[in-house]
Amino acid sequence: MNKQWLHFFSVLLLCYVIEETCSLKVEDLPLPKTYLKAVELAKKDAGKDTKLLEKGLLILKNNRRDCMTNCKLVDTCHRLSPECCPEMTPTCLKLDIVQAFLKAQGKL
């Protein structure tokens, strides 16, 4: 009985690993020029304060990921994630977070 559970969880883990490696993530996409401009502005605004720069870049990264499913999150979503805002492109529809969002909405 214990071996059956071990085999079951091994197969389950293997399925999870395969799905994670095959799915397209936001981090896998090339960064758009408009996002890179926002990063440069954040660097300029932060000056020599590294903690402020880290926080600013983290906010930009999180907003980019969150804008993929909600274009009305911030006014600059179309600049942070042009793949998905104002309209979802085929690349956007392949992203794991977008697919999960659409599945939760019942649109997929």
Swiss-Prot record:
Coiled-coil annotated spans: none
Subcellular locations according to the entry: Secreted
GO cellular component: extracellular region
Keyword terms of this UniProt record: Disulfide bond, Secreted, Signal, Toxin
Tissue specificity of this protein: Expressed by the venom gland.
Signal peptide: 1-24
Posttranslational mods: Contains 3 disulfide bonds.
Molecular-function annotations in GO: toxin activity
Recorded family membership: Belongs to the scoloptoxin-10 family.
Name the record gives this protein: U-scoloptoxin(10)-Sm1a
Native source organism of the sequence: Scolopendra morsitans
